[in-house]
Amino acid sequence: MMTIREYKRAETLEEAWQLNQKKANRVLGGMIWLKMENINVGTAIDLSGLGLDTIEETEGSFSIGAMVTLRQLEEHAGLAAYTHGAVKEALRHIVGVQLRNLATVGGSIYSRFGFSDVLTLFMAMDCSVELYKGGIISLQEYAERPYDRDILVRLIVKKEEAEFFYQSVRNSQTDIPVLTCAAARLENGSYRIVIGARPLKAVLFELPAKAGVSAQELAQNFADEVKQKIVTGSNMRGNAEYRCHLAGVLTKRAVLELEARTAQEEN
């Protein structure tokens, strides 16, 4: 059980940051995973008064506040159009609407859980995080960092000429995934393939364009490359060998889907 001694609704990011420097204090997100921990919290820091619960779309980017809920992401028309439905596909399996109305983007990204659909999804994009003291860094770099006591302010997704596709394998509809796969095909034909729930943290593979090969051959080549390089582990949902096999299967499916979509748009 989690016990909270004091509650503070931060009025500024500076105040939130100062409070968060004490080891016993915690920043509150949607309270999905935090409330399950057996911890004593000195001061619970609430960011809900800082205006971080909006998604702002401009001609060149999306700015997604840390307090935006997963349900807001799921229902955002601009993100749906930009990702060809990949955002909705990544989020719709996460437990249920009630939970997605509570869980926040900031909590999902800060936690960097191995099973995170959210982390897998955004790593396939040109995505950065803005930290209050640390500034703007790439999501990939942030995912590799150890936990610190900075405040995650927002995600910044730069729009690019790309097609996106998301898939996951689950033992049941709303269970934690056995493996996740987000793919992006860039305008020059190169790919970003992100594999999550290995059950380790999501990992990015950047695969260069290959001219003069069929979609089937390209998909098989990329699938083989991912299978050769990926490191997987075992847990109650699947063993390492099974996950390695799935990584190849999902990569191949993603490449075939995106190549078919590109060919259709060109015709």
Where are these regions (language model features)?
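C-terminal structural segment of proteins
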Residues: 1-267
